[in-house]
Amino acid sequence: MTKIDSKIPEGPVAEKWTNYKAHQKLVNPANKRRLDIIVVGTGLAGASAAASLGEMGFRVFNFCIQDSPRRAHSIAAQGGINAAKNYQNDGDSVYRLFYDTVKGGDYRAREANVYRLAEVSNSIIDQCVAQGVPFAREYGGLLDNRSFGGAQVSRTFYARGQTGQQLLLGAYSALSRQVNVGTVKLYTRYEMQDVVLVDGRARGIIAKNLVTGKLERFAAHAVVIATGGYGNAYFLSTNAMTCNCTAAVSCYRKGAWMANPAMVQIHPTCIPVHGDKQSKLTLMSESLRNDGRIWVPKKKEDAIKLQKGEIKGSDIPEEDRDYYLERRYPAFGNLVPRDVASRAAKERCDAGFGVNNTGLAVFLDFSEAISRLGIDIVLQRYGNLFDMYEEITDVNPGELAKEIAGVKYYNPMMIYPAIHYTMGGIWVDYELMTSIKGLFAIGECNFSDHGANRLGASALMQGLADGYFVLPYTIQNYLADQITVPRFSTDLPEFAAAEKAIQEKINWMMNIKGKKSVDSIHKELGHVMWEYVGMGRTAEGLKTGIAKLKEIRKTFEKDLFIPGDKEGMNVELDKAIRLYDFIIMGELVAYDALNRNESCGGHFREEYQTEEGEAKRDDENYFYVACWEYQGSDEKEPVLLKEPLVYEAIKVQTRNYKS
């Protein structure tokens, strides 16, 4: 079996990153100008990486699927970004953030990578403040913090409910400066279709101009993928509709391993599904769980009345409400990690206590917070989120609904779990390089930092850590040996072959000429993924799901209809290319979930749970990173490789959020 070298430095975990930086290879300024780097993606990870590499003097080509980097999905992040500043003097530290992240990930993350993430977190806040990011501040002017799930300290920095937007504007300003200087060339409305390998190394990409429809070749000494996750394989998710995994899957087909694809995060606080016409779901920030309390009725008859629309949540008095997270997990209450909160909501709804007409919703209530703090303070913290919820549902969570026996009850939100984030992704080593030399993956599209479950407010932290403070060091260790390599010509046969393969795939899709639209097949895919590869998984269900996924792939291959022409702009063609890769990724998620006969974090196999319904890990047999290797054809099952996990600073134990 292939032995996997993750290139983790020697020494204590707290010294690994410092020692690495002290001994890594460097590229001098004159040589940096001769080296080209392609960065695919302009979200927080991609924009920060492109800006940093350009500022260092490299020649950078940055690709953006949207009209502007400001439309990257990072802009949708609401609640905040974690850092171990300990401004609240509540016991936080780099080690505490490291420990909480490993524990939150159910001990399935690589220890050394997580410690580095916690270590550089403080620098991220300093960098963003210097860029002018308007983080919330206390009355005295100091940066404010709030709490997120899986932590007992307040370490989350935020800008109301638009933290991702403000951080992205900061990264975009840094990127724009380098575009103006000339070190970065920005390509908007381009989508990567394949990575080009020359002598086994990543030397460029084939990208589709989404305006003209033409395929174009781009060469570089190294390629960085920063294209996000694969949550849209489930069709309904909190991801933007353009989010896709085509770049990642193209790397997988060329030999990059896909790691832990079964680790998919389901966010507990999303607006429930309303009918079968929706194209996406809306997230309600985890920050709401700071002051919001999650509950269902204690009495099933009350739940039935709610489902029939005979009563409202505000009609149920305090003594008849079950604040089930506070009851089950007294130490963390409503701030348990996302996988725990999501499964608890599903369990209550499956037991018949759901509160809407589908029975698939629970309440998130702010009555106690408004009574304790006053409506003005609550609106200062969450007003924009309340407005968004009202815009979508026509219910104002800050509006007094009823007063019973002197107790004021406000309109509660209805929430239910939904697909949100993918902890799995392209395998990378400590240097963020994939199993293909010269190909790097950063941000959500890699697997490296979150194990089986990501803590809230840590996605923004990882994206900016990778782009600002990790990749600029590690990529030099690779490029230092490339300084004598001249710039590549896109006339090389490897580029021609890659472009030809993509063009043939496009021709094939356009010539299927079936009857089913891209969206209809995507909906079928999403239904199968949610039903069989969603929150509750079983061996039997996963086998059924794999069979159905293969049927969906056959339907695509025989009955897909794409209107229009392959020349020029064709949005349906672009969606079809992405959909086929979602199907391949969906199969990979199911294979990994079926192979992993344990429950951990976001991967919950119903056969493997405790008597209390908690995840039951199997550290003896599954204490590894699952790396899936492509076998040359979409028809062949991938081969599993294993990277054993090694923990030196943390004792592996069963997660406990009850005490």
Where are these regions (language model features)?
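Glycine- and aromatic-enriched mobile tails/lids
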Residues: E15, N19, Q24-V27, N31-D36, ...
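Core beta-strand elements of the Rossmann-like FAD/NAD(P) dinucleotide-binding domain
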Residues: R33-L35, G213-A222, S435
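Glycine-rich Rossmann-fold phosphate-binding loop(s) that bind the pyrophosphate
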Residues: G41-G43
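Short beta-strand "acidic-cap" motif of Rossmann-like dinucleotide-binding folds
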Residues: F58-C64, A259-N260
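Conserved N-terminal glycine-rich FAD pyrophosphate-binding loop of Rossmann-like flavoproteins
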Residues: D67-Y99, Q265-T269, D276-K280
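Conserved redox-cofactor binding core of oxidoreductases
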Residues: I124-K214, A226, C270-M284
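Glycine-rich loop(s) and the adjacent beta-strand/alpha-helix scaffold that form part
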Residues: A222-L281, H450-Y473
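An anion/pyrophosphate-binding glycine-rich loop and adjacent beta-alpha core
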Residues: S250, W257-K402, Y473-Q476
